[in-house]
Amino acid sequence: NVEAPKNNAEEHFVVVRDLKTAERVFEKAKDREVAFAVVPGESLGNSESDGQLSLFSEPASNDYLAVSICFSEEDIYFICTGDEISSSFLDEKLNTLEVKSWIAPDLKTNLHRFKSKEIKADDRGRYFDMMVAAYLINPLVGEYPYDAVAKDYLGLMLSSKKDYLGKLDFTRMMKE
């Protein structure tokens, strides 16, 4: 039997669908340590015309469904694109927001979002990639899903992506 601290995140989780609230969230995140994750749309990916994965090309599109952003135990937001909020708005906010540090489960795939920021050697502590850190601690594991990393290194029990979505992908889940 695994003992883990209670996860109260769901009590503070807020879904944002309007521009005014999204603006307030980003303003509140200023000068904080910010964790984020991008929920890609179907067209996002490093694919070449023949469908092969490319390691060196920019993503095919900047379209995505949402950005999750968290900067305290009580400030946990899921900002959805839609009628009022566009992918380009979220890109601009991520690109221009001044924070103490950025933390992401797969920061490497999101570095292009910081195109206006010149990342220098002195900035190393400002960008933290959870998957790279988990790999450096234990390179023998084949994959590093967020729920396993949270359990192994934080003692938190989180539901997996499969637990939340079942057989759906994010695009279908957002439509339902």
What kind of region is each of these model predictions?
Residues 1-96, 100-101:
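Long, highly charged low-complexity segments
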Residues 7-8, 62-64, 68-176:
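Active-site-proximal helix-loop-helix substrate-binding element of RNase H-like nuclease domains
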